Amino acid sequence: MAEGVRRLLGKPGSVSLQPYIKLLKTIEEREEALRKLSDAELTEVATELGNAELPYDRDDLAELCALGREAARRTLGERPFDTQLIGMMALLDGHVAEMATGEGKTLTGALAAVGFALRGQRVHVLSVNDYLARRDAEWMRPLYTLLGVEVGWISQESTTEERRAAYAADITYASVSELGFDVLRDRLATDVSELVVPEPNVAIIDEADSVLVDEARVPLVLAGAAEPAESDAAMAELVRRLRPGIDYKVDDDGRNVHLTDTGINVVEKALGGVDLFSAEDTTLLSRVNLALHAHALLHRDVHYVVRDGKVRLINESRGRIALLQRWPDGLQAAVEAKEHLTPSETGEVLDSITVQSLVLRYPIRCGMTGTAMAVAEQLREFYELEVAVIAPNKPNIRIDEEDRLYATAEEKEEAVVEKVKEVHATGRPILIGTQDVAESERLAKRLRRAGLECVVLNAKNDAEEAAVIAEAGTYGRITVSTQMAGRGTDIRLGGSDMRDRDRVVKTGGLYVIGYGRYPSSRLDDQLRGRAGRQGDPGGSVFYVSVEDDLITTNLPEAKGYRVSSADGEITDPAWKEMVNHAQRIAEGQLLELHRNTWRYNQIIDVQRSVVLEQRRAVLHEDLGSRQLAVDCPETYQRLVEEVGEEEVARAARLVTLYHLDRGWADHNAFLADLREGIHLRFLGRRDPLDEFNRDAVPAFKGFLDEARARAAEMFEKLEVVDGRLDVAAAGVKRPSTTWTYMVQDQPFSTDLENIVGRVKNLMGRD
């Protein structure tokens, strides 16, 4: 009934699984026949299945499922459940399969990858990190080998040749960031032989909600001409002396900070009587604002950690160190100055691509996750993906208790410690999920003071996270973890070897405690899903306080609660619903931010595609030579006579590509500046997006003609040196080094909030 109503309303729901379920009996019959075949004969069956194109008809699909099941049994010692085969078929139909934790998503994805690969599709299995990419590729390798398909994987340490070899395989496992960086590097290639990433066919995305929603806006960046950034230690020291609440104020939602009139006077006096709002030097106000944001809004062990003398950002959706992420250069340098660190390198952005744009390159997209329905609307809106909700192989018997709500953070912490004492006394393993690093360490200290020894898994020791989380089901173990660190690793009752499984089962299984609700219900569900794996017993409960960021940020006016007991607990159902309401507000804000970023990126992606198509023609079709032969006929002919057609073609290619790349880098910088300042026009009651498009479109008009004209101008200046055309002397200068990173987009507020806040300050001055 509910599903039918959703369809009538046009809202995303689960796709019908009936076509897949109807095949299960046929699959089982085929499986019996395949069991009699030798390995070589099984490989031959796989080869024969590949003698056709997608999609699979019902007969071939049943054969493929039976083949995958038998191959997995022989090579991995695992016979896929019916639910895994249903998930496999959903992936082959281009859906996102929602499968609970522990239901075998890795094998499901591998079986689907085989199905695509046998039909001639190049498959990229995208993971959230290098560890999982390598682990899953090696784990599934025997299965792939038996079925006659090759598998490869790449990591941050992979050489160019190793990457090329991995991408040449039928199936390639890679983290989203590494794939994106390879795509960006290919966009600077000056010869076909330098290209690494083949044309995209199929993307199977693991942890699809994390990649496609949480990180969709994250730009992957390729920079060149790196040089040390300027340290602003003096400005950091100045804002360090400012008084909170007097010289500056932080907004109630904690997303913006601004100087008060008193603070403006203090800063201007400290800087020698300058006018912060002088039109002659706009950089001074920017420097002050950056230093103030770094000081007041970005907190060590919450938003970042300092490791090996460097600022390392914490990925908010995963609770892990994000080694490849950084803030935009000015803010990055401000945080480094705040921490008295040497400023890291900065450089010119040559190109960038968001995770969303990276995934949309693939004609066929599908994925797996434990929490897809909660973001079904985004998956449909941004990726044209539908969700297939697949029931667990065994019924879920986990007991999810009602939230426990407290008046203060201190009372919540005390209640959690008491609960841990009570549960730990039974030997039941406990997993506590916290919001950030500082919180995990503070709670761990409190537990230890109470005589409760615990293992802390947070962004500071992420290298061992898989091994640590694998033991969280050990009898008597207490594990404190930031958000979803260790995601992708199963927690087995009794420890990784399951030695004490029966004893842990008798205690009630893993007990999960959420130390505060997350900004997204999906993150809550992911934490809960750690318990009750594959029909195991388990339990979960969330402890929340009115002082939690989720409440104070999204419902700052919430007051008037009544404490129900001496320990500060609030049992009023209306107040518990307020927590859900605050979470819905947070989710709505994130969705609108995603939509807003997508709208701005649409025009940029269209313009980028024009440049990339031109670049492809220059690399593969000698477009540069043909254009310059027309634009500079006399010079072209003279040079051909001097050095030959091949050398002239090489020089023409390098010159043409240089001006395409140079022009795009300049245009990209223009778009970034335009995007940064566009919200000022909101104050004039004009729509910022319309204004952005109104400026971005004409700025790109004539781009290709301009690049072609500049290439012709440079081509005329080419000289022959030792039998070759010296393009460097003519001005072709490629960056000596390039580097890649991910930008932490909008860490504390939108551009509009920041700029309007500054303008309010300006308008408030006499």
From Swiss-Prot:
Membrane topology: Peripheral membrane protein
GO biological process: intracellular protein transmembrane transport; protein import; protein targeting; protein transport by the Sec complex
Pfam families xrefs: P-loop_SecA, SecA_DEAD, SecA_PP_bind, SecA_SW
Residues binding ATP, per UniProt: 84, 102-106, 490
Annotated keywords: ATP-binding, Cell membrane, Cytoplasm, Membrane, Nucleotide-binding, Protein transport, Translocase, Translocation, Transport
Compartments in which it is found: Cell membrane; Cytoplasm
HAMAP family: SecA
Subunit: Monomer and homodimer. Part of the essential Sec protein translocation apparatus which comprises SecA, SecYEG and auxiliary proteins SecDF. Other proteins may also be involved.
Family that this chain belongs to: Belongs to the SecA family.
Function: Part of the Sec protein translocase complex. Interacts with the SecYEG preprotein conducting channel. Has a central role in coupling the hydrolysis of ATP to the transfer of proteins into and across the cell membrane, serving as an ATP-driven molecular motor driving the stepwise translocation of polypeptide chains across the membrane.
Protein name: Protein translocase subunit SecA 2
Highest classification ranks of the organism: Bacteria, Bacillati, Actinomycetota, Actinomycetes, Streptosporangiales
Gene name tied to this protein: secA2
